[in-house]
Amino acid sequence: MFYYPNVLQRHTGCFATIWLAATRGSRLVKREYLRVNVVKTCEEILNYVLVRVQPPQPGLPRPRFSLYLSAQLQIGVIRVYSQQCQYLVEDIQHILERLHRAQLQIRIDMETELPSLLLPNHLAMMETLEDAPDPFFGMMSVDPRLPSPFDIPQIRHLLEAAIPERVEEIPPEVPTEPREPERIPVTVLPPEAITILEAEPIRMLEIEGERELPEVSRRELDLLIAEEEEAILLEIPRLPPPAPAEVEGIGEALGPEELRLTGWEPGALLMEVTPPEELRLPAPPSPERRPPVPPPPRRRRRRRLLFWDKETQISPEKFQEQLQTRAHCWECPMVQPPERTIRGPAELFRTPTLSGWLPPELLGLWTHCAQPPPKALRRELPEEAAAEEERRKIEVPSEIEVPREALEPSVPLMVSLEISLEAAEEEKSRISLIPPEERWAWPEVEAPEAPALPVVPELPEVPMEMPLVLPPELELLSLEAVHRAVALELQANREPDFSSLVSPLSPRRMAARVFYLLLVLSAQQILHVKQEKPYGRLLIQPGPRFH
């Protein structure tokens, strides 16, 4: 199983909440559930399963999930989505309840239209109508006469006064037309307004996949009733019926006369009434026939949660240990600056380009030619020693050749510098093959005496233009020297290239050193190196920071 810190780390990983919801590693709050974007998470899981995610660093393999991890993440997505749906249903129910409560508010203030329907306030009318304190002034044929507001009736006097008998007057019969049915007064409300309506129940949202319980069949009801009857029978034990042998023994003991049934006599009184067999109480059971006492019911164990995996989540200690070992990670390559990456000439000339750029045929020819056999080198050692002695003889000029070479320089100075550098390299290679004991005695014993050079007469200096030459010593080759040489070429209105800095006959170490310095200057944007075609002319141009 693969663990990725950037995927499963809590609060930082993209699948941390999904992983915790699937494994039940810790309790999640509502905010963490609602923070998950289910659609985007499903797309990311699908990209990881189908190996579409790019590696975190170039050169590393693409991350892929195991079957266990992908299954756990799918279960976690289902649980998170289910919890989000549950939160949505709860929020909707809460909103509906609050709306229902807002509709059930009872108004206790009187409406503005109701006071006009009531009887007029006489005291208020007296205060408003100062000119007519008696509101009933000028009104005639008022029956019954309303009391005056100035006379306060005595209730006790009214209660004690005798009520006069009223003679009923029979009005004459007058033919009347059939009247229309009386209309219901406005004060009577319709039954719909009086009837108390039940609150409409809140409908629950149907959840997909939820099934109702099946109806109980007749057979299942019979089985349940039979189980209840069996439980009742176990609680009240019945006596077994007497054996036929016991019944015969009882009959013989009583005799034939007692067994004979007596008829009913009217004069005889029934002193005792024996209950029938069905109503007789059962005799207490004997200790031999007592049923065994059932053992006390065993206490049910608490239901435990089922875990399919013994270890649902890796422990923090083991997780940290795996991170420290870095067994599943690649080490980050140490990138050195161009000033420190010094390659030897053998590596530079044996690897012309990347291996993927050249076809295999050309690459094989190049590697074959770039690696000379060691035997050929050993054979050339004595030949090179003889050539070196000849070069030393040639290098010692005579008194006549010195002014001639000074006036007519036929051989460029770079050739002589290259010859001296190659001689120095061969001297170093020969000295390195000698053991240290002999090397210490080498300058004392075999050091030849320096030959006496002839005195050269002084000649007047002839102003002449010297060719562009870099210092022959590798230690003196620096960025400033290469920069100065390129600047001189540009001042002379010439197009500098690599061959103008290093001649074709110069040693490989010098060419590699100058090429390395050019790369450093191009990285610093001081120079701009361009090559139009492979193995072609290497042009040098001033960069943005050239000054």
UniProtKB/Swiss-Prot annotation:
**Taxonomic superkingdom:** Eukaryota
On this chain, the residues bearing Phosphoserine are: 148
- Any S-S bridges, and between which cysteines? none
Bias-annotated ranges (Pro residues): 282-296
Q: Where is this region: Disordered?
A: 278-301
Q: Principal place where this protein is found?
A: nucleus
Instruction: Please provide, in alphabetical order, the Gene Ontology terms of the cellular component aspect for this entry.
Output: kinetochore; lateral element; male germ cell nucleus; meiotic cohesin complex; nucleus
PTM field: Phosphorylated.
Give the UniProt keywords, A-Z. Centromere, Chromosome, Chromosome partition, Meiosis, Nucleus, Phosphoprotein
Q: Which GO terms describe its biological process?
A: double-strand break repair; double-strand break repair via homologous recombination; fertilization; male meiosis I; meiotic cell cycle; meiotic sister chromatid cohesion; oocyte maturation; reciprocal meiotic recombination
Per the UniProt record, one Pfam family is: Rad21_Rec8_N
Entry's localization field = Nucleus; Chromosome; Chromosome, Centromere
Q: In which tissues is it expressed?
A: Expressed in testis and thymus. Expressed in the B-cell lines WI-L2-NS and Namalwa (at protein level).
Molecular-function GO terms, alphabetical: chromatin binding
Q: State the family named in the UniProt similarity comment for this chain.
A: Belongs to the rad21 family.
Task performed by this protein: Required during meiosis for separation of sister chromatids and homologous chromosomes. Proteolytic cleavage of REC8 on chromosome arms by separin during anaphase I allows for homologous chromosome separation in meiosis I and cleavage of REC8 on centromeres during anaphase II allows for sister chromatid separation in meiosis II.
| Subunit field text | Interacts (phosphorylated and unphosphorylated form) with SMC3. Interacts with SYCP3. Interacts (phosphorylated and unphosphorylated form) with SMC1B. Does not interact with SMC1A. Interacts with RAD51. Forms a complex with EWSR1, PRDM9, SYCP3 and SYCP1; complex formation is dependent of phosphorylated form of REC8 and requires PRDM9 bound to hotspot DNA; EWSR1 joins PRDM9 with the chromosomal axis through REC8.
Protein name (Swiss-Prot/TrEMBL): Meiotic recombination protein REC8 homolog
